[in-house]
C-alpha cells in the first residue's frame, strides 16, 4: 500500500553521456511524494527477503527544480541552436537500474504548459503549494507516463540542520523545526540530439514556433517560474537570436498583430568582388582563353588581367644607391657628359670653361708644324730618307778610313768632296734663312699667337699635334757659328780615320772623359802612356803596364797614346780593343810625320828670336833625343812669345843641327816601321788573355828587353856567370836592381809606383 509523505528532493543528472560531469540539484522546500515498500530485487546472502522503500513524483516538479538551480545548463531556446535533449531516468525497481526514456525535452514542455490549470503568485506560496500537490496527485493518476521513481533515503543535511536548530532554540531564537528526516533521490540523464529546422514538416515548425511563443503568449502568472528565471530566459533568448542571424515573422491569428523584424546591429563586411569565376574547367575555345568570348566569365578574366597589370606598374621599388669613394654617383646625372677624347674628364672639374672661340685661320696655322724647304724645286725629304742618306755617307767615310796609307790621297779627295757637299747643303740652308729677315718677324708673331691659342685651348690639347722644332729654333744653332772657318784638313785627318779619334781634339772642359784626363795628366807628370791612372770612377786604382815592351816602344815612336786599362772596363770592351788598335797603327804614321814637320818649322821660326836661356833648353832637349829615341817627340814643339831682338848665329846652327838629326832619325824609322807594324799585328792576334789578368800585369815567362847600357854593365861585372841572365825573368828583379835600373825597367805595380816617385 502507498502513502503520501513530505520530503525533500535530491536530483542527480548528467549532460552528454557524462562527459561534462554530473550535477546535483536540491529542493529548498519539501515536496509531497508517494512512498511504498516493495521487496528488494537485489539478492542477499541469506534467504531472508528485504524490503525497499521507494518514492514516486511527477517529472514537471523535477524539471522545475533543475531550472531553478542551473538555468544556464538547460536553455529554453535550444531548438534555435539546432539541437535538443532526450531525457532518461533510472528505474530502481528493476535489476541493474536501467535507463528509461521520457522523450524530447521540447515535447515534454509543450505538454506541461498546455495541461497546467494553476496560477503562480508570490503572495500565497503556501496555498499554491498545497493546491499544486493536490492537483499533481490527481494528474498522476490520470497520466502515469510522466511519473519518476526514486529511492527514499535518510537526509543527512536534515540531521545537521536539527543540531543547528537545537542550538538556536537555546539562544532564544525561533526556528522552523518541520524538516523531514527522509529525502527522495532521483537520477536523470540528458543526451543531446541534433535537429534541422528546414527538413522538418509544417507540424514540427508550428510546434516549435509555438514553443518559442510560450514566454510572450502566456501570462507571467501562469508560468511556474520565478521573476529571476524569467529575466535570465529573456537575456538568453536575445543572445541566441544574434548568433543565429535569422529573422522569423510570428503571425498570431488570434490577436492579428505582426511581430517586429529582428535585424543584425553589426554591419556586414563589404564584398571585394561581385562576380567570381566558376570552379570547374570549361572547354577551351579557339582563342585558348578557356572561356566563351561573350560570356561573363571571359569578361571577368579580362578584368583580372587588367588589374594585375596595373598593380605591377604601380609597384614602386626603392632605388638602391651604391656609392664608392673612388667613383662618383651617376645614378642621377644632372650634367651632360661629353664623349670626346679630350673632354671625357671635364665633368670632374668644377670651374667654368671659357667660351671664347678661336678663328679657323689661326688654328690651322698653329696646328701646322713649321718646315723649311731648302730646294724649292724638290719636295721635302722625309725623316726616313734623311736617315738613309746620312747612313750612306757615314759608311763611305768608314770604308775610306779602313784603307791603307797608300790610298790616303784618294780618300782625302773623297772626304773633301763629301765635306764640300755638306758645306754646300749648310750654306743653302743659311742663305735661305738669312735672305728672308722679314719672315722671322712673321714667325715670331705666329708663335705669340700660337701661345695665346694654347692658353685659350688648354682643354683641347690632345686634338692638336705637337709642333716640330725648326732649324732656327734649335738650341744648338745659337751655340754653333756656321760662318766660322773650320780647319777641314785637320778635321778630315782626325775625324774620319777612326770613331774615337775626335775625342783628342776637344777640350777637357766639354767632355771630362778618362782618355782626355789621362792625356793631360801624362803630359804634366811625364809618365808613360801605358800606365793607368788612379781613377776611382773607372774602378782603376792600381797602375798596370802594357802587355809588351815592343808595343810601348812603337807607341813612343809614333807619339800615339794607346788605349790603356782605363778604357778596358768590361770583358766586351777588352776583347774589342785589339781590333781598334790595328786601325791606329795605319793612321799614326801620317800624323807623326805632320807633327814633326810642324814642330821643326816652329822651332826654326822661334830660334831667330830666342834668348840664351832658350838656347840652353834646346841643347838639353837635343841631348835627350840623342840618348833616348823612344821618348815622345811632342816635347820638341816650343810655343814662345815673339821678341824683337835679333837672332844669333848660334841659334841658327843649333836649329840646323836639330833638323838634320830629325831627318836622319826619321829615315831610319821609315824602314823599320813596316816590319814593326806587321809584328805587332801578329802579336795582338795571338794574344787572347784579358789585359787586366795577372798574365798581362806580370810578364812571368817573357824575357824583358833591357837597354844596351844595362846589358853592357852586367856583362862587365859578371862575364863568366851564366845564372845572371835568369834574373831578368824573376818577378822580384826590381828589388835587386837599384837606382837607374829600377826606373828604366818596371816589372811589377810596386816597382812602377817607385819609378813614378823617382
Swiss-Prot record:
Q: Which GO terms describe its cellular component?
A: chromosome, telomeric region; nucleus
Q: Where is the composition biased (Low complexity)?
A: 395-408
List of residues that carry Phosphoserine = 454
GO biological process annotations for this chain's record? rDNA heterochromatin formation; regulation of transcription by RNA polymerase II; silent mating-type cassette heterochromatin formation; subtelomeric heterochromatin formation
Q: Which InterPro entries match?
A: Spt21/Ams2
Q: Which UniProt keywords apply?
A: Phosphoprotein
Residue ranges, compositional bias (Polar residues): 626-651
In this chain, the stretch annotated as Disordered covers: 251-271, 372-414, 438-471, 624-651
Reported function:
Required for normal transcription at a number of loci in yeast.
- Protein name, entry field: Protein SPT21
Gene for this protein? SPT21
Amino acid at each position: 500500500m502507498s502513502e503520501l509523505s513530505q520530503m525533500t528532493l535530491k536530483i542527480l543528472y548528467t549532460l552528454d553521456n557524462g562527459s561534462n560531469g554530473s550535477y546535483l540539484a536540491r529542493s529548498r522546500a519539501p515536496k509531497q511524494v508517494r512512498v511504498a515498500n516493495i521487496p528488494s530485487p537485489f539478492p542477499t546472502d541469506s534467504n531472508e527477503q528485504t524490503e525497499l522503500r521507494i518514492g514516486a513524483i511527477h517529472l514537471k516538479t523535477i524539471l522545475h527544480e533543475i531550472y531553478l538551480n542551473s538555468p544556464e545548463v538547460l536553455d529554453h531556446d535550444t531548438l534555435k541552436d539546432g539541437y535538443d535533449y532526450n531525457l532518461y531516468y533510472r528505474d530502481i525497481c528493476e535489476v541493474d537500474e536501467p535507463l528509461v526514456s521520457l522523450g524530447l525535452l521540447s515535447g515534454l514542455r509543450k505538454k506541461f504548459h498546455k495541461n497546467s490549470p494553476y496560477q503562480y503568485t508570490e503572495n500565497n506560496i503556501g496555498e499554491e503549494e498545497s493546491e499544486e500537490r493536490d492537483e499533481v496527485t490527481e494528474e498522476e493518476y490520470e497520466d502515469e507516463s510522466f511519473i519518476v521513481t526514486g529511492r527514499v533515503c535518510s537526509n543527512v543535511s536534515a540531521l545537521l540542520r536539527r543540531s543547528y536548530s537545537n542550538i538556536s532554540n537555546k539562544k532564544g531564537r525561533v526556528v522552523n523545526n518541520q524538516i523531514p528526516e527522509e529525502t527522495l533521490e532521483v537520477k536523470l540523464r540528458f543526451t543531446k540530439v541534433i535537429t534541422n529546422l528546414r527538413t522538418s514538416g509544417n507540424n514540427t515548425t508550428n510546434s516549435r514556433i509555438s514553443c518559442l511563443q510560450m514566454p510572450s503568449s502566456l501570462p507571467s502568472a501562469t508560468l511556474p517560474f520565478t521573476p529571476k528565471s524569467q529575466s535570465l530566459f529573456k537575456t538568453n533568448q536575445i543572445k541566441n537570436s544574434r548568433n543565429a542571424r535569422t529573422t522569423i515573422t510570428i503571425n498570431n491569428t488570434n490577436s492579428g498583430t505582426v511581430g517586429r523584424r529582428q535585424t543584425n546591429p553589426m554591419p556586414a563586411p563589404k564584398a571585394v568582388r561581385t562576380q567570381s569565376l566558376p570552379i570547374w574547367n570549361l572547354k577551351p575555345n579557339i582563342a585558348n582563353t578557356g572561356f566563351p568570348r561573350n560570356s561573363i566569365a571571359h569578361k571577368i578574366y579580362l578584368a583580372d588581367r587588367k588589374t594585375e597589370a596595373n598593380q605591377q606598374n604601380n609597384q614602386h621599388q626603392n632605388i638602391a644607391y651604391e656609392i664608392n669613394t673612388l667613383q662618383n654617383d651617376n645614378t642621377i646625372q644632372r650634367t651632360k657628359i661629353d664623349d670626346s677624347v679630350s673632354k671625357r674628364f671635364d665633368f670632374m672639374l668644377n670651374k667654368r670653361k671659357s667660351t671664347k672661340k678661336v678663328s679657323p685661320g689661326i688654328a690651322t696655322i698653329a696646328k701646322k708644324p713649321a718646315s723649311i724647304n731648302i730646294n724649292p724645286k724638290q719636295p721635302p725629304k722625309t725623316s726616313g730618307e734623311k736617315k738613309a742618306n746620312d747612313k750612306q755617307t757615314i759608311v763611305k767615310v768608314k770604308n775610306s778610313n779602313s784603307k791603307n796609307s797608300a790610298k790616303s790621297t784618294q780618300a782625302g779627295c773623297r772626304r773633301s768632296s763629301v765635306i764640300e757637299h755638306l758645306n754646300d747643303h749648310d750654306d743653302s740652308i743659311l742663305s735661305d734663312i738669312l735672305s728672308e729677315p722679314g719672315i722671322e718677324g712673321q714667325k715670331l708673331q705666329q708663335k705669340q699667337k700660337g701661345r695665346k691659342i694654347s692658353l685659350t685651348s688648354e682643354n683641347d690639347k690632345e686634338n692638336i699635334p705637337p709642333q716640330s722644332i725648326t732649324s732656327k729654333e734649335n738650341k744648338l744653332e745659337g751655340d754653333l757659328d756656321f760662318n766660322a772657318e773650320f780647319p777641314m784638313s785637320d778635321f778630315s785627318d782626325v775625324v774620319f780615320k777612326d770613331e774615337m779619334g775626335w775625342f783628342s781634339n776637344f777640350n777637357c772642359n766639354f767632355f771630362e772623359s778618362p782618355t782626355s784626363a789621362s792625356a793631360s795628366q801624362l803630359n804634366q807628370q811625364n809618365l808613360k802612356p801605358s800606365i793607368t791612372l788612379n781613377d776611382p770612377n773607372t774602378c782603376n786604382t792600381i797602375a798596370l803596364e802594357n802587355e809588351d815592351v815592343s808595343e810601348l816602344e812603337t807607341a813612343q815612336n809614333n807619339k800615339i797614346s794607346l788605349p790603356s786599362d782605363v778604357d778596358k772596363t768590361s770583358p766586351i770592351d777588352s776583347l774589342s780593343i785589339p781590333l781598334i788598335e790595328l786601325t791606329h797603327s795605319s793612321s799614326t804614321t801620317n800624323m807623326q810625320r805632320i807633327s814633326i814637320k810642324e814642330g821643326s818649322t816652329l822651332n826654326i821660326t822661334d830660334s831667330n828670336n830666342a834668348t840664351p836661356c832658350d838656347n840652353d833648353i834646346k841643347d838639353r832637349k837635343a841631348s835627350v833625343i840623342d840618348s833616348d829615341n823612344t821618348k815622345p817627340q811632342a816635347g820638341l814643339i816650343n810655343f814662345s812669345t815673339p821678341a824683337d831682338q835679333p837672332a844669333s848665329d848660334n841659334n841658327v846652327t843649333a836649329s840646323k843641327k836639330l833638323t838634320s838629326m830629325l831627318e836622319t832619325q826619321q829615315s831610319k824609322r821609315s824602314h823599320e816601321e813596316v816590319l814593326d807594324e806587321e809584328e805587332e799585328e801578329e802579336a795582338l792576334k795571338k794574344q787572347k788573355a784579358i789585359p787586366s789578368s795577372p798574365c798581362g800585369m806580370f810578364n812571368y815567362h817573357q824575357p824583358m828587353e833591357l837597354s844596351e847600357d844595362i846589358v853592357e854593365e852586367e856583362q862587365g861585372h859578371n862575364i863568366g856567370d851564366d845564372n845572371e841572365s835568369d834574373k831578368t825573368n824573376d818577378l822580384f828583379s826590381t828589388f835587386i836592381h837599384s837606382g837607374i835600373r829600377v826606373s828604366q825597367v818596371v816589372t811589377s805595380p810596386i816597382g812602377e809606383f817607385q819609378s813614378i816617385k823617382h
